[in-house]
Each structure stands twice: as structure tokens, then as C-alpha cells.
């Protein structure tokens, strides 16, 4: 089996740049792709991605490129683009990839309109690739600076996931391998919506007690959803589930928390700014839950606020007015 000496990273935002540095620290030759030739030239000249991750030097093993073929020719490709453009970019990669190339989704979301998880999107758009997913509690800045981080890499072929995890791991970036692809994807998608709710609680200054209750009850929703879609319990309580929820719901370094914080402070849905995947995932997540009879009141409240059906205060009141019940 390939040792994965060459790694392609498609997407030169903050997370893509951080993962490119991760792979280079592990001794891999990395092609970091951006669609923008000017950004590529700037990264090559400055050895820094000033647009995506300023202040962090690119590792020596990272080669920026605007040629998608160079990234696609690598032995494994990390797809580090927003969830809602995963299908389009996977389609661009499809004719360039060798059959069986691992194509690893590093986005945390569900496609709007289709309610498809990212590995399903990859499977449809790039059928010759081997879909995988990388997820877990990780801020790009922490990872890029070499601070200790642990994540999960999942693929249907557990041996392949183990081999690729070993190829990307280092003394500061630990990858646990898994074959529970769906469980890892569910944790990454659901926690973003719950982090928006946590940000709203902070923005409304509802207190630490409310924040703790929100996180605990939100995790109960994540578990119910996961069970309904066949996730393994250990995955949901692991890095890609509970671990990522704790990180993302913990403060404004999280884009989704920051989005919710602004929403809670102003009562208005933020426009522009950094991408918050949870804002796009909420409606799909809630619809999927309803289709399986899964109760997710916190996520449904976030969706109602984002769609304008409820005000922030109205959503809080509705949650607190729910009938008393046993904890489960």
C-alpha cells in the first residue's frame, strides 16, 4: 500500500493551509492549491498565506500551485473547501484523479438541497475516488502553530484510514483512525449548529449555567440524531462528536460561536464575515431529523431564527416553555 509521500491540499484558506503544514511536518511533499494565481504567487514569494492564515510561515515541504492537476496527481488529496462547494470542486477533480485515490473531506456540513453528507457528495461527483473524512476539535491557528491537536480520520476501509493517518501524524498532530464515516460526519455537522446556539446564549448574556445546559442538551440532540443514522456511540462521545462540540461551543475563536454571538447581541443574522458552516447546515439537519422522527429542539430553534420564523428571544422562550420530561 502507498506510503502517501505526496499529499495534495485543495483549498488555501486557513484550514487548508494548516493541514498543508501538518502534512509537510510529517515529511510529506505537499501541493497546496488555490484557484487564484495571484494568491499562489504571493504564497510562493512570501512563504506565508497572508490572505488565509497570516503570520504563519509555510513549511518548506509546501509548494503552492494554481494547477489543480498537480494536487490531483498526489497519492492522497485533502479537500478543504466549504461544504456547499464540495460537489463542484469534487467534479473538477474527478477527471484528474487516479482511480482509488483517497479524497478526504475536511469540511463539516451537510449539502443544502440534497441533505447529503460530504462523503456522499464526493462519491457522486468523483466516483473513482475513495471518500474519507477528517474531523475533530481543531482550530486552524492552533494546528498551524504546531500546538498539540488530536482528530479522527475515517474511511470505509479501516486499513486505508490507518495507513493515511500514520502518514499525516506527527508529534503535535495525532490522528485516530475509524471506519465509522457517518458518525464522524454527523458530529462535525451537528456541532456547528449547536455552536451557533451557544454563541446566542453568550450574546444574550444568559449566564454560564445556561451555557452549560445548552451544551449538555445539545449533545443529547447530537446523540439522538447519530443513533438514528447508524453512528457508533463511541464515535459520538469521541473527538469528532463531543470533543468538537466542546471546542466549537466554547468561545469566539470558533466561527460558528462568533456568528451566534453576533446574532445574540444584535438580534440580526450576521451578513458577510467569516464562513459559519452551521448557518448553511441547520435547515438540512433539522429536515433530516424530522424525517427520522428525531427531536432536536435546539437545532430547530437555531433554524427558525436563521430563517426569520422566530426572533432570538422568541426561540429562547419557546425552548424554556417546553413540557417537563425525564432527562434522556
UniProtKB/Swiss-Prot annotation:
One of its GO terms (molecular function) is glycerol-3-phosphate dehydrogenase [NAD(P)+] activity. It is found in: Cytoplasm. GO terms for biological process: carbohydrate metabolic process; glycerol-3-phosphate biosynthetic process; glycerol-3-phosphate catabolic process; glycerophospholipid metabolic process; phospholipid biosynthetic process. Its EC number is 1.1.1.94. The keyword Cytoplasm applies. One of its GO terms (cellular component) is cytosol. InterPro entries: 6-PGluconate_DH-like_C_sf (IPR008927), 6PGD_dom2 (IPR013328), G3P_DH_NAD-dep (IPR006168), G3P_DH_NAD-dep_C (IPR006109), G3P_DH_NAD-dep_N (IPR011128), NAD(P)-bd_dom_sf (IPR036291). The active site is at 191 (proton acceptor). PROSITE patterns: NAD_G3PDH. Keywords: Cytoplasm, Lipid biosynthesis, Lipid metabolism, NAD, NADP, Nucleotide-binding, Oxidoreductase, Phospholipid biosynthesis, Phospholipid metabolism. It catalyses: sn-glycerol 3-phosphate + NAD(+) = dihydroxyacetone phosphate + NADH + H(+); sn-glycerol 3-phosphate + NADP(+) = dihydroxyacetone phosphate + NADPH + H(+). NADPH binds at residues 15, 35, 108, 140, 255, 275, 277. The keyword Transferase does not apply. It is an enzyme of class 1 (oxidoreductase). Sn-glycerol 3-phosphate binds at residues 108, 136, 138, 191, 244, 254-256. Pathway: Membrane lipid metabolism; glycerophospholipid metabolism. NCBIfam families: PRK00094.1-2 (NF000940), PRK00094.1-4 (NF000942). Belongs to the NAD-dependent glycerol-3-phosphate dehydrogenase family. Catalyzes the reduction of the glycolytic intermediate dihydroxyacetone phosphate (DHAP) to sn-glycerol 3-phosphate (G3P), the key precursor for phospholipid synthesis. This is Glycerol-3-phosphate dehydrogenase [NAD(P)+]. The gene is gpsA.
